[in-house]
Amino acid sequence: LGDASLGMGRDYYQKEDVKNTEALAEYQKYVASMLKELGYKNADAAAKGVVDYEKSIAKHLLTNEQSRDNTLQYNPKTIAELSALVKNINLPEYLKKVGVNTDKVIIGELGYYKNFDQLVNANNLPVIKDYLKFHMINGGASYLSQKLGDTKFAFYGKFLNGQQEQRALDKRAFEVIDGT
């Protein structure tokens, strides 16, 4: 089982320095701009909630160094063991409803699941909805419209990675087909 996605690498949320503080501020603006495209009237406040939520998730994820250690990412658990960690969801019932029939799962981020009930509960449901909406539009931005694709490139391509210009549409199309 995987964990929740972050919009940037874990260290941006956890290492407090000038570079990461600037990146988080730009990321929050980016999240707000994407939520505005979804019609949010309170996009700035929702974006702050999304970024704060991702910070709370990042606290429980492996560091880059730890994630290279396969023994830390290989955590076999029975459904009963996982259910003891994750109490806010009736896991056996959920797995049955989605058609998964298994007695064991392998968890890559055990810290996330140990803190799942703190991260996913009725009290933070509104921010979780904003988080999910943002990640849906962010994931498909390059395919939804030129404006969304350009906005995504401006943040991830230019700001985070220093690319001067976006690759040509035909090259990007081949990358999608090739899965690269």
Give the ranges of each region predicted by the language model.
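Noncatalytic, helix-rich "gating/capping" subdomain that lines the substrate-entry/channel surface
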Residues: L1-T180
